[in-house]
């Protein structure tokens, strides 16, 4: 195991970090380095005399400097790279800057800019972060974790991705470590989790992205993505080792492909503390948006007719949780299922669907007899326009990654039959959104209740500024992770997710107007943060080891 640069020690003044390192080694440790904020006494004790300019800064002074540097970056990718560099130098300053400007910087460290950073990973590769595990060496999983240098009680959360289904941009191989790092930053900034107690992991099974396979600078396995038994061996090894070495850690699954995400969650959910953000987190945040929208429309969930355009893991996960609410409101399971129309890559899911139905899609397939008179294209597909015209939905949800799929004709058809159409183009990044809020507002004469997956600027329309709600998983997963950690939960349950959704659905302050109808705030109450700090020491004080 790698030697730890510090020990956490309880003192009458609280928990402090007793530093083992000396000299320039302190300055290259991002978690210990405070740069010019080291006092003269700390510099002498840590062997830093002469290694820093003479002046001593406050963290407020450092914040002004780095925020100015950040603002001078020419574009969002440059800002993302600047923040990554700051994190590599001084994590205390990075997280202070991020928490001070969370609304401004969340789209930079997380969606949508993180998608561009992932695409550029081969060219912008710098300091390696996290743990890299290869399908070609599944026996090295334990060695990799040990080399990371954390003990069995030092880890609260492990964020793992195999990078097959990154956001809306697909397979990007080991570049997916960037999405794990982005999630880590949000867990810390929004919920107060300690960055050193979170491990980002990429499970490198290869890639089917031809651009990466041909790129000489690509740092991952340069072979086609491995599937089947060898892939399962890597996943089994990862789960077995992680749960044994870090028994209290929540295993967070991120951006796995449709063929594996549901299967992996189903396999391990009953045996360990595990959470799939794309399935459970997305479902919870969309449930929050849906509950708020239904409330704003003066209706009930059981009265909704829902079209889901994009019947993958996220879309069906959303359907599952909305369906459970309908059942809780009095519908039978069959009645609730009949409220949904889900479309895959080959149109409406039906009993005679022209493609292959995955197990999790089967419950949403409409009987062939029911749609026998509906027009189909030459390949036997029933398209979105026909589904909207025939089903007259009250709620239209997009998880298809097909930009512009919600056309003016489709939206006006929907709005002709419902007073307050609920429309959620959720695909990320922004370039993959099914519609632009400005168009949705114009096409519905300002009547639509809108939530998007990516951030959009307010929309002026007929003298009113419409604040666009973002159904961002960051409203759910940080607080969920904090709660699981504080109470030492053994499983992530459906009631936990329902409680998170209900809390996020309640409007506060400016969220009570126009298209923004549910909670937009930092996750985690001050009480929970205080409890978290009692079990997760924060590196706020330094002492020098003798």
Task: Describe each model-derived feature in a short phrase.
Residues 2-272:
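N-terminal ligand-binding/catalytic initiation module
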Residues 144-146, 168-179, 210-217, 261-267, ...:
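Short acidic, glycine/serine/threonine-rich loops at helix termini
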Residues 28-32, 107, 177, 224, ...:
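Hydrophobic alpha-helical scaffolding
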Residues 197-198, 248-254, 300-304, 329-338, ...:
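Flexible, glycine/charged-enriched surface loops at secondary-structure junctions
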Residues 271-272, 276-395:
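Glycine-rich phosphate/diphosphate-binding loop of Rossmann-like nucleotide-binding domains
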Residues 379-446, 456, 488:
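Long hydrophobic segments that form regular secondary structure
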Residues 127-129, 151-156, 194-198, 246-249, ...:
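Short coil/turn connectors at secondary-structure junctions
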Residues 32-33, 275-281, 294-297, 421-539:
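Adenosine-phosphate binding glycine-rich loop
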